[in-house]
Curated annotation (Swiss-Prot):
Upper taxonomic lineage: Bacteria, Pseudomonadati, Pseudomonadota, Gammaproteobacteria, Alteromonadales
Protein name (Swiss-Prot/TrEMBL): RNA pyrophosphohydrolase
Similarity comment text for this entry: Belongs to the Nudix hydrolase family. RppH subfamily.
Annotated PROSITE patterns: NUDIX, NUDIX_BOX
Gene source species: Shewanella piezotolerans (strain WP3 / JCM 13877)
Role according to the record: Accelerates the degradation of transcripts by removing pyrophosphate from the 5'-end of triphosphorylated RNA, leading to a more labile monophosphorylated state that can stimulate subsequent ribonuclease cleavage.
Length: 173
């Protein structure tokens, strides 16, 4: 769905583990890494689109995750001119995104990049929370920064809990 301003409705998905690290995925056949994301279909809510994209891109189902947060508003980024398809109607100049922060409840073995037979990603890894802001393609950085800042109060306490848990397990002689 492309709105009257030329922005395509889209959902972005940040999956964190119990340590507060986030899933970082490499686009199939490319050297670029990003969070899972995808378009919102006509008549579909943002949450419905998120669950559909979650399965299509990383093979996870609703029972594998828990929604921790979603962005208060839609965030936009413009595509560089070289990526705008002028021959398509209506012309899409960028994306407007509703973001979801999910916590993986199941084993990471549930992640299946080939769940739908046409993978969007060919590799993934856990990275530190702020890592994606510096590493994502430049035209998405502002949105990533805003999303990560908004979700930080929810995610960063997970890192503190994990750190405290590890400390309690250490013994001094």
């Amino acid at each position: 769905m492309i709105d009257s301003d030329g922005f395509r409705a889209n959902v972005g998905i940040i999956i964190c583990n119990r340590s507060g690290q986030v899933m970082w995925a490499r686009r199939f056949g490319q050297h670029s890494w990003q969070f899972p994301q995808g378009g919102v279909d006509e008549g579909e809510s943002a949450e419905e689109a998120m669950y559909r994209e979650l399965y299509e891109e990383v093979g996870l189902r609703p029972e594998h995750v828990q929604i921790l947060a979603s962005t208060r508003s839609w965030l936009r980024y413009r595509l560089p001119k070289r990526l705008i398809r002028q021959d398509s109607k209506p012309v899409c100049i960028g994306q407007k995104q509703k973001w979801f922060l999910l916590q993986l409840k199941s084993s990471e073995n549930a992640i299946d990049l080939n769940a739908c037979g046409h993978p969007e990603f060919d590799d993934w890894r856990w990275v530190s929370y702020w890592y994606p802001v510096r590493q994502v393609v430049s035209f998405k950085r502002d949105v990533y920064r805003k999303v990560m800042k908004e979700f930080a109060p929810t995610t960063l306490p997970l890192q503190v809990k994990e750190s405290n848990h590890k400390r309690r397990g250490m013994r001094r002689n």
